[in-house]
Amino acid sequence: MDSTLISTRPDERTVSLSRARRAALGSFAGAVVDWYDFLLYGITAALVFNREFFPQVSPAMGTLAAFATFGIGFLFRPLGGVIFGHFGDRLGRKRMLMLTVWMMGIATALIGILPSFSTIGWWAPILLVTLRAIQGFAVGGEWGGAALLSVESAPKNKKAFYSSGVQVGYGVGLLLSTGLVSLISMMTTDEQFLSWGWRIPFLFSIVLVLGALWVRNGMEESAEFEQQQHYQAAAKKRIPVIEALLRHPGAFLKIIALRLCELLTMYIVTAFALNYSTQNMGLPRELFLNIGLLVGGLSCLTIPCFAWLADRFGRRRVYITGALIGTLSAFPFFMALEAQSIFWIVFFSIMLANIAHDMVVCVQQPMFTEMFGASYRYSGAGVGYQVASVVGGGFTPFIAAALITYFAGNWHSVAMYLLAGCLISAITALLMKDSQRA
């Protein structure tokens, strides 16, 4: 019997509700910071970075360059997953989670004071890419640790609900980042916003970091991780990520396929559509900034509600339903954009970025972490999650913008791209064994 798996189902009596709540709150607080910082970059890249950091190229190429730097962060996420996962499996989840918040906050604040191309020339985009890489490295270690600590600390029959705070943090981060950018945008002229207004949300990250560190300081390691330490002497002979790859190679491919729906629905609605609707359709930028506010606010309710349903009726059922809703909403979303119908744009944005997206993300924490043994779970789930981020999400706005450019503004290829990703996720979930019922 695999000793690393002995501790995957600890006696329910050892699970402390107090510890579970602190773990859920700490995971949520850190996730808010990391996702606020990470998503803020995507929003600002769509509005500002093409002109502030890439003014020497055409508007279309500037947009592609800005979205390419957005994707750079995703390239460094697997590396963060490997490094933080390795030490998280050896030294504990909490230490790594404190470090990820520090790194993300510092990198984001530095972007807020970064001089533009007109001041320091090509050093501006070089430094921007460097700081974006640090952001990606930090968030690469965040999800695995936060998901594990909340799942391992949760009662057996409420793992989706207690760990949903990791994804609610995404919604709150989206709400805060979009809300602050929208507020600054309304309070400033276009010239003021491009000159200094966009920097304020990046500097505000410092406040969020201090709050998250205070909350996370009260967390404890999970009972499951502490039990696993009995087998640490044997585990030290193996590198955790290698152990995960050797024992569960198929799990990484499953995670990539399962995350396509989540990544494409969110980044097409919140990042790509913001640029496409303003540059190609002539719609006001406030439209998708306000949609981002709405989506972020609703997700704070929909994610825990869907997680509760998943604990009660089955994670896989909820996942498949969400992915199919994304599949069916892909073309109608772009048809609404073409018709410039505000009602239907908002409706299908919610269907994609709230209903479809939130139904799949609410169960990912227990679904993905239970694919791996406890002694290499941080590495396995974390790296798998972040590799999927690169393959399925990091360059989604870039790919979508490139498709629009290649097909001379025609949106059908992007809609098909979105539809295919959601359908692949639905089929993968359908073919999986339901570990919740095992």
Language model regions located:
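Extracellular/periplasmic helix-loop-helix junction of adjacent transmembrane segments
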Residues: 45-77
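Extracytoplasmic gate region of multi-pass secondary transporters
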Residues: 42-43, 249-298, 392-397
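Helix-to-loop junctions at the C-terminal end of transmembrane segments
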Residues: 81-93, 303-315
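Glycine-rich segments within core transmembrane alpha-helices of 12-TM secondary carriers
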Residues: 161-185, 384-396
